[in-house]
């Protein structure tokens, strides 16, 4: 399960409870945070240490538009760092060295995009009709 959007550690207690259930079901937990790992470890807010302890993979650092990248999977800007907090994943896993992908689904006259397209990719699809 991935926690992102807003700041997950602002809701650390509630998300730790969810993460506990996810882990109990044998699934992994990935968290995207604008805080760095050092900043999170220094926090004393309720639930922060618990959520960190339940996190398999942390992507830390604020998104920086001037450092935008699509070359690293799941990472939006070059300043963001992947921290492998458990042995569930390893930095040697080839999935972590692939670029981002864009998935396009067309069904029933609707188009759904999932992913992070390279700049200009959507404009090459043409105007909406």
What are these regions (language model features)?
Residues 1-50:
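Conserved Radical SAM active-site core
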């Amino acid at each position: 399960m991935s926690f992102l959007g807003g700041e997950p550690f602002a809701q650390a207690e509630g998300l730790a409870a969810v993460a506990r259930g996810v882990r109990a079901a044998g699934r992994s937990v990935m968290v995207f945070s604008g805080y760095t790992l050092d900043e999170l470890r220094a926090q004393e807010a309720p639930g922060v240490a618990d959520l960190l302890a339940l996190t398999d993979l942390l992507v830390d650092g604020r998104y920086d538009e001037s450092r935008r990248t699509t070359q690293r999977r799941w990472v939006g800007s070059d300043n963001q760092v992947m921290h492998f907090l458990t042995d569930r994943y390893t930095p040697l896993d080839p999935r972590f060295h692939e670029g981002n992908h864009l998935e396009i689904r067309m069904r029933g006259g609707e188009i759904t995009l999932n992913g992070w397209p390279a700049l200009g990719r959507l404009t090459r699809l043409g105007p909406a009709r």
